[in-house]
């Protein structure tokens, strides 16, 4: 069995890739360059994780996206919410809009679908999850269902996107990741990179962007030692 894992190097996609490995898929990982500020760190992280999982790794250039994106992920204008803001829908929605990259997931998953069909892979593994689905419409079960419906018409081999984390929040994802590490006797989580910024040192997180805040909370609430180094704890 073959599968494509869309691997940004972040916690969600790292755990998703572990899940694909646990299911005995022959994995090929893809990382997308859409002009994001953290690109170099994401590639380093994804490459390292791919090596650990014995997966072929590819970087796919969709840098044209930054020509029309006003996202903070492209411009560097990254919001820094307070911890108590993470569960405030209105504030989280505002933060989401500040980092939203137009149609990013649609573009990435469409390309991943073509890649999957081309190499004869039957599934695309994505890190879409419940916590981000609260504010990001392209992280919801509805998005997954309708995207898969389009693949019935857009691919000949009827490749399917799966999201093993779609019912999980971040602490549950961290816990699952640790469990999979133990079962597979692999160490992956400490090499994952969630930060929206490139902080000039491999695997070093800023600790203040929303993604870092959610990562911190995930490990803490899961009762797992956080292997991450932060500029701001």
UniProtKB/Swiss-Prot annotation:
Cited InterPro entries: QueC (IPR018317), Rossmann-like_a/b/a_fold (IPR014729)
The keyword Repeat is annotated on this UniProt entry: no
Protein keywords: ATP-binding, Ligase, Metal-binding, Nucleotide-binding, Zinc
Cofactor(s) this protein cannot do without: Zn(2+)
Similarity comment: Belongs to the QueC family.
Function: Catalyzes the ATP-dependent conversion of 7-carboxy-7-deazaguanine (CDG) to 7-cyano-7-deazaguanine (preQ(0)).
Protein name stated in the entry: 7-cyano-7-deazaguanine synthase
């Amino acid at each position: 069995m073959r599968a494509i894992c869309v691997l940004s190097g972040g916690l969600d996609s790292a755990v998703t890739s572990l899940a694909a490995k646990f299911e005995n898929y022959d994995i090929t990982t893809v990382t997308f360059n859409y002009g994001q500020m953290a690109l170099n760190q994401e590639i380093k992280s994804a490459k390292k994780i791919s090596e650990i999982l014995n997966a072929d790794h590819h970087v796919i250039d969709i840098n044209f996206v930054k020509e029309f994106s006003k996202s903070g992920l492209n411009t560097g204008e990254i919001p820094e919410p307070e911890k108590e803001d993470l569960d405030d829908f209105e504030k989280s929605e505002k933060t989401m809009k500040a980092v939203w990259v137009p149609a990013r997931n649609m573009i990435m998953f469409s390309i991943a679908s073509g890649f999957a069909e081309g190499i004869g892979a039957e599934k695309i593994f994505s890190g879409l999850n419940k916590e981000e689905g609260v504010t990001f419409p392209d992280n919801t079960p509805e998005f997954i269902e309708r995207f898969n419906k389009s693949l019935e018409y857009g691919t000949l081999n009827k490749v399917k996107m799966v999201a093993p984390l779609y019912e999980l929040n971040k602490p549950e994802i961290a816990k699952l990741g640790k469990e999979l590490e133990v079962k597979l006797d692999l160490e992956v989580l400490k090499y994952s990179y969630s930060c929206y910024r490139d902080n000039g040192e491999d695997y070093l997180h800023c600790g203040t962007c929303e993604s870092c805040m959610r990562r911190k909370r995930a490990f803490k609430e899961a009762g797992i030692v956080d292997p991450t180094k932060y500029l701001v704890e």
